[in-house]
């Protein structure tokens, strides 16, 4: 069976071969508990700390400012819930944006039910947050701003450094969900200036079920999971050594080849976009033209339904929809709604995302399949 061309790298990524090899000993022989003081615990303990250093080198931060989690969702929950909880006496106001991942928006909704108020910032037609809107939303009760670094649907990269600068002037902490940006663009913490940053392993060719949370100097995250005191007493539970090793190796690879990989993904993305624009009328590329992830293209096909397009191309191309079309209504993603994309365009939005393994031959075959499907649906 020939597998479809994979163009959903923002959804998840395949395991890099080097990641699989790095993890192999911890599947086959190195089963020890890293908390054990005997011989069997020594190598797993060393492997966890090596991985912590590898993640830190990609982000440009000391290893001691990182804890391992089960992924981006847990990191976001931890960053918002425990920090907000620890600062409750100082303030109860959180600022976020309308295009955040549910792993941030749903946490903020949870906090609203526990004594906090939340301001949701709008975005422009390109999906950008205006830092002046963030500044205007700050009150004397604001304790945390959580804005994603790059959007998972349209790829728009937010002005996080500028938002962090204005927040710092007011003594407000800033968290960024960097699940989509880590490994694709520069995420050096000295440039971003944030206090907390979330990482998701499965977006960077590491396994699902592992991630990391950075917390900056002076930031004291509360205990998220009580128990035997692993991860500096912040997140108890025996470490998932196998997947932590995989995350570390993935970060090492990303750090070594960041520019090269970004250039390749951008070339493949641009080949797809230019091909679609040449072959088809009435299409629109969503997101910022320049401030956009190098691998991400969100394409709206006028007066078509995304799920119909995906059904047509499914044997050849794997991608994802920006709108779910049901028999009686169209459910447009909250991101496209926030960008105020007209329904005639939004309902036909498909996200294609390239990766390190995408080839020009795959893009050309995908172009043929997508173009043929759209033409057939428009007859």
Locate predicted features:
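Pyridoxal 5′-phosphate
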Residues: 1-379
């Amino acid at each position: 069976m020939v597998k479809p061309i994979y163009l959903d790298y923002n959804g998840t990524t395949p395991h890099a071969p080097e990641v699989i090899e790095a993890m192999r000993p911890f599947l086959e022989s190195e089963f020890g508990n890293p908390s054990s003081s005997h011989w069997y615990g020594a190598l797993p303990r060393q492997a966890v700390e090596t991985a912590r250093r590898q993640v830190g080198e990609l982000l440009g931060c000391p290893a001691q400012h990182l804890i391992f989690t089960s992924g981006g969702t847990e990191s976001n929950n931890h960053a918002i819930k425990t920090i907000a909880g620890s600062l409750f006496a100082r303030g109860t106001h959180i600022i976020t944006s309308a295009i955040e991942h549910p792993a941030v928006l749903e946490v903020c909704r949870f906090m609203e039910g526990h004594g906090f108020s939340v301001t949701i910032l709008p975005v422009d037609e390109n999906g950008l947050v205006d830092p002046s809107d963030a500044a205007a939303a700050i009150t004397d009760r604001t304790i945390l701003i959580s804005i994603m670094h790059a959007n998972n649907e349209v790829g728009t990269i937010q002005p996080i450094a500028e938002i962090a600068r204005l927040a710092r002037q007011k003594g407000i902490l800033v968290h960024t969900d960097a699940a989509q940006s880590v490994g694709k663009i520069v995420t050096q913490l000295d440039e971003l200036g944030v206090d907390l940053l979330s990482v998701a392993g499965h977006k960077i060719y590491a396994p699902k079920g592992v991630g990391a949370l950075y917390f900056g100097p002076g930031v004291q995250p509360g205990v998220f999971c009580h128990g035997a005191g692993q991860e500096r007493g912040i997140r108890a539970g025996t470490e998932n050594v196998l997947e932590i090793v995989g995350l570390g190796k993935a970060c090492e690879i990303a750090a070594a080849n960041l520019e090269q990989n970004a250039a390749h993904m951008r070339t493949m993305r641009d080949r797809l976009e230019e091909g679609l624009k040449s072959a088809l009328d009435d299409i629109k590329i969503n997101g910022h033209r320049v401030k956009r992830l190098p691998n991400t293209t969100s394409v709206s096909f006028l007066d078509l339904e995304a799920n119909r397009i995906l059904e047509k191309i499914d044997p050849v191309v794997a991608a994802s929809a920006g709108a779910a079309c049901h028999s009686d209504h169209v459910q447009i993603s909250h991101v496209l709604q926030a960008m105020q994309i007209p329904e005639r365009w939004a309902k036909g939005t498909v996200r294609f995302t390239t990766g390190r393994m995408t080839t020009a031959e795959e893009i050309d075959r995908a172009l043929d399949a997508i173009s043929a499907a759209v033409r057939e649906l428009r007859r």
